[in-house]
A protein has these predicted regions:
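Short glycine-enriched nucleophile-adjacent loop
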Residues: 209-221
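Gly/Ala-rich beta-loop-alpha elbow adjacent to hydrolase catalytic centers
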Residues: 202-209
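C-terminal His-loop and adjacent cap/lid subdomain of alpha/beta-hydrolase
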Residues: 1-198, 218-389
Length: 389
């Protein structure tokens, strides 16, 4: 018996060790994949208004897969003219600093400031500070919409903190939050110290919304009003700022564009922080406590759009169902924009327009923008399908 028990323990230990090795290798492979170079995004940009381009302080190779995609897809003058029916005011600026662009948080932040100076970012009327997801991904749709509405007169800046998907980057939230706080604080100081007439906006989606909100809360404790507005999309549970905004300040949570439009039509001003969370987004509702306790949203008489009225809570089962739903939440078809679950693509144009103060956009321009965003996404998917070098 003792020999058999010892053999079982040894087998269990071996399986556990092997699983750990396999998981570690898998994570390393994912990270390596997010540093790889794609065929369609292999050539450094020539423009002096994006990172990795002419005169840039950031090397193109250090941007990683997500950064290279972002800087190579800045909206061009012809597209702005075709969509908006007006000439470009200025070329849009896209600044991206990768995890390999500089070794420390402080150096990455300073590199971002230097890069904004070199690319002309501080000469734009708006700067959007994007809080990336775990891989370094910044939602291209939101940024392109912003560039179209601004007729190019906008700069976007983002600093990468990791190379793994959001579900594998939860241990990076604290680091990402501190990085975002440092960037926001440094930008606010630079704008104020130089008397620049620039509106500073925050943007984050999913894990980027969580870390971005934590960063805003952190820098707000050091002074008041670090930003001029924010758009937070699909915020996961656990954000202290989200709780403060909704429970203490009464900031509304919007499920869809029509709700935001109705809110404004009622005479309300645009919230300092515009919150977009779908009623049926599993990412915004998943909690560890759902394993043993019914969440509040299931107790509500009106569960909201897209939530099945017959959905029930069962101990343990609901937790794993939520985990599966969260994992599958980002499954989408390129160009077919949805407004459900964790797919916010159909909502973004309207929310960007209102949250960032683009009051000079008419219905035709909005319609054209939404069509262009779909076209761009289809082309992007074709580019990505070409594969890696």
């Amino acid at each position: 018996m003792a020999i058999r028990a010892g053999a079982m323990l040894a087998t269990t230990a071996a399986v556990g060790f092997g699983t750990k090795i396999a998981a570690t290798r898998g994570i390393r492979a994912i990270a390596a994949g997010n540093r790889a170079t794609e065929s369609a995004y292999a050539q450094a940009p020539a423009a002096a208004t994006v990172s990795g381009g002419d005169g840039s302080a950031v090397s193109f190779d250090s941007l990683g897969l997500q950064g290279r995609r972002l800087v190579l897809e800045a909206t061009d003058a012809d597209t702005i003219k075709a969509v908006m029916g007006e000439p470009q005011r200025q070329p849009p600026v896209r600044v991206y600093v990768g995890v390999e662009s500089a070794p420390s948080v402080e150096e990455r932040v300073e590199l971002a400031i230097t890069e904004l100076e070199k690319t002309g970012g501080f000469e734009r009327s708006r700067i959007v500070v994007a809080s990336p997801a775990g891989t370094g991904y910044v939602n291209y749709i939101a940024i392109e919409a912003c560039e179209l509405f601004a007729r190019g007169d906008v700069a976007t800046v983002a600093i990468q903190y990791g190379s793994l998907p959001s579900m594998l980057s939860l241990d990076k939230v604290s680091e990402a939050s501190s990085l975002y706080a440092a960037l926001i604080g440094r930008l606010r100081s630079h704008i104020d110290d130089n008397d620049l007439e620039i509106s500073l906006f925050a943007y984050g989606e999913s894990l980027g919304a969580l870390s971005g909100q934590n960063g805003i809360l952190e820098v707000s404790k050091q002074g008041s009003g670090p930003i001029d507005g924010a758009l937070w999309v699909g915020t996961p549970t656990g954000s202290a700022l989200f709780e403060e905004l909704t429970h203490e300040r009464g900031v509304p949570i919007f499920d869809r564009p029509s709700q935001l439009a109705a809110y404004i039509d009622e005479g309300n001003t645009v919230p300092d922080a515009t919150l977009l969370n779908h009623d049926n987004d599993p990412v915004t509702k998943f909690t560890l406590s759902s394993f043993y306790s019914m969440p509040d949203w299931l107790k509500a008489s009106d569960r909201g759009r897209g939530v099945h009225p017959a959905q029930r809570w069962l101990p343990g089962i609901a937790f794993f169902q939520g985990l599966i739903d969260t994992k599958n939440a980002a499954t989408v078809v390129p160009g077919e924009f949805g407004s459900t679950g964790h797919d916010y693509r159909a909502d973004l144009a309207v929310f960007v327009m209102i949250a960032f103060g683009f009051s000079d956009v008419d219905d035709e321009q909005l319609k054209n923008t939404e069509a262009q965003l779909r076209t761009s996404e289809v082309q992007r998917s074709l580019n990505i399908a070409e594969g890696k070098l």
